[in-house]
Amino acid sequence: MAAKKQPRTKAAGKKAPPQRHQKQKAVARRPTPARKPSASRGPSTVHRKPSVAVRVKPYDVGPLTDWPAYDGPPLGAHVSTAGGVAEAPARADLIGATAMQIFTKTPNQWREPAITADEAAAFKAALANSGVRFTNSHDSYLINLASPDSAIRARSIDSFTRELERCHALGLDALCSHPGNFIDDRASGIARNADAITECLEARPGPTRLLMELTAGQGTVIGSTFEEMAELIERIPAALRRRVGVCLDTAHVYAAGYDLVGDYDGVWERFDAVLGLPRLGLIHLNDSKAPFGSRKDRHELIGVGTIG
């Protein structure tokens, strides 16, 4: 989330003091609380069909005593796990979230820490004492299950399998994953991606559902069209396919050419016809910095970008 360019003072020609990020209209305004440590964050996250979600920094929020009544599908955001995964549910409560996405590890490193029994127990206890009703993880940004490079693909399979282990240990509802980059040939990449997912799901059975995230279509990435995502999922054996669903990121699909502004109902009708609404497990609500059909993955705060 990029900070706004700061104005220069005319008198001294120096930059004005940094300003806080503007909160989105959906957030009730309140006094700014004491600053808390920052940590990793991701896109707004909601389970199934939300009405609105908000991207916020952990240190920008405090308890919301005036949070409006909400009884819809689980709705929330990506929250920090700084200090341990057991800290995340309380942070979700600070913003009134009933859905929560986390990283179970640092997403831009190959290091694969296991979740200990004590960590899992503490997380589950904290979750039970929170208002969160849906939890999911987002996997590592380094994973490429479609890679033609055997070493990268093997390392990706190992990392993805360990991510499933951590999700199962924590009892998470879902794991959100980006399809890989085919690099050489699209059809071969889709086949490699599906085979790798199959291998991982067979190796780690459990309750966590895998949600494949639709992409913006940049470079050689797989999964920017409903048809391509359907092909990927259909290549997974039927016995395992029931554990696989879809995550729709609004910024991604808009950049990929699905007109959420001019043909909102039509986009969902197409999704249902090709993938089926029962496969929809998660929506990432993001605005887009990039224009419609640009095939660029550039997130923006809701209401600020090209979706509006």
PLM segments and residue spans:
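A short helix-to-beta-strand connector/capping loop
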Residues: D71-P73, S130-V132, G206-P207, L240-R243, ...
